[in-house]
Amino acid sequence: MAFTWIRHHILGLEDWQPEEYQTLLQTASSFREVLSRRTKKVPALQGQVVTNLFFEPSTRTRSSFELAAKRLSADVLNFAPGSSSLTKGETILDTALTYVAMGTDIFVIRHQQSGVPDLIAGEMDRLESGVSILNAGDGQHEHPSQGLLDLFTICCLLDEENPRLELLEGKKIAIVGDILHSRVARSNIWSLTTAGAEVHLSAPPTLLPKYFGELCDRLFLHWDLEPALEKADFVMTLRLQKERMTANLLPSLREYHQSFGITRPRLQSCQPGVKVLHPGPVNRGVEISSDLMDDPDFSLISQQVTSGVAVRMALLYLIGNLRSDQ
């Protein structure tokens, strides 16, 4: 029986079912083919309005969502908080309602506080506006589109023609870095463990609290790097989010790199053909060495950026198409 997409908002991946991941992978694969054409545009969301509400700085995610919406022929509005009525005391909800009155169909929302996309989604549902919310990263909660594009990147490497969830069954994936503050880590934990992968988290104790081990099955914690990397199929390294650190959680960036930085020699204990991912932006020479980051034999960072457009097209299409059917 064919799976029917019914999810109106994309707020996080914690409750996603395997069928939803598979539908997303198949849809993103179709749009990846579209993006390989000379004419990279389709009329799937023609006449719909996508509004990017980004309350904290972003280059990759905002640009990727904007390009994805435009490739689907949607009209795109970009919100700039510094020049908005928020500086005059307007609330976030009132700002959103202003854009609803302009005809917004889908909000893409990033905010430094966890839960803001959920709050706006709840208000949209209460008002029966029909507007969908897509979380582009909220505080330390989740970053679902990043988790999905990482999943898609890995699956495409394993089978470019037919990326599917089952390809990750039994794979070992190490996630190294600032786990404590990372919404990317949380979304990847949900997606990768649902796919059947073993996820090994590694960081200094100050950046990897013990409670992470209670999130789900197939999740392992390491306060040393070596056991996390041993026989790993993929290594995902995360940026140290210094802007979110309110205490001295690390002696120095140099000492962090010496203990947890991903370098070519450290990958020798991984599986042959190991690949490295990073959600960006990258602190070269801190989370990962420059030579490794730029080596196409190891690094999937460029592929992650490319995959991001196809995955975000798929997300916008799935919720936008659901809206058009209502």
UniProtKB/Swiss-Prot annotation:
State its role: Catalyzes the condensation of carbamoyl phosphate and aspartate to form carbamoyl aspartate and inorganic phosphate, the committed step in the de novo pyrimidine nucleotide biosynthesis pathway.
Pathway it works in = Pyrimidine metabolism; UMP biosynthesis via de novo pathway; (S)-dihydroorotate from bicarbonate: step 2/3
Q: Which PANTHER family match?
A: ASPARTATE CARBAMOYLTRANSFERASE (PTHR45753:SF6), ORNITHINE CARBAMOYLTRANSFERASE, MITOCHONDRIAL (PTHR45753)
* Gene name of the record: pyrB
The question of whether Repeat is a record keyword is answered with: no
Keywords from the named record: Pyrimidine biosynthesis, Transferase
The answer to whether the entry has keyword Transferase is yes
A single Gene Ontology MF term assigned here is:
amino acid binding
Residues reported in the UniProt entry to bind carbamoyl phosphate: 60-61, 110, 143, 146, 280-281
Q: Which Pfam families match?
A: OTCace, OTCace_N
What is the catalytic activity of this protein? Answer: carbamoyl phosphate + L-aspartate = N-carbamoyl-L-aspartate + phosphate + H(+)
Q: What class of enzyme is it?
A: transferase
Q: What is this protein called?
A: Aspartate carbamoyltransferase catalytic subunit
InterPro entries recorded = Asp/Orn_carbamoyltranf_P-bd, Asp/Orn_carbamoylTrfase, Asp/Orn_carbamoylTrfase_sf, Asp_carbamoyltransf, Asp_carbamoyltransf_Asp/Orn-bd
**Organism of provenance:** Microcystis aeruginosa (strain NIES-843 / IAM M-2473)
Instruction: State the family it belongs to.
Output: Belongs to the aspartate/ornithine carbamoyltransferase superfamily. ATCase family.
Superkingdom classification of source: Bacteria
User: Biological process GO annotation list?
Assistant: 'de novo' pyrimidine nucleobase biosynthetic process; 'de novo' UMP biosynthetic process; amino acid metabolic process
User: What's a single GO CC term here?
Assistant: cytosol
HAMAP family attached to this UniProt entry: Asp_carb_tr
| Subunit details | Heterododecamer (2C3:3R2) of six catalytic PyrB chains organized as two trimers (C3), and six regulatory PyrI chains organized as three dimers (R2).
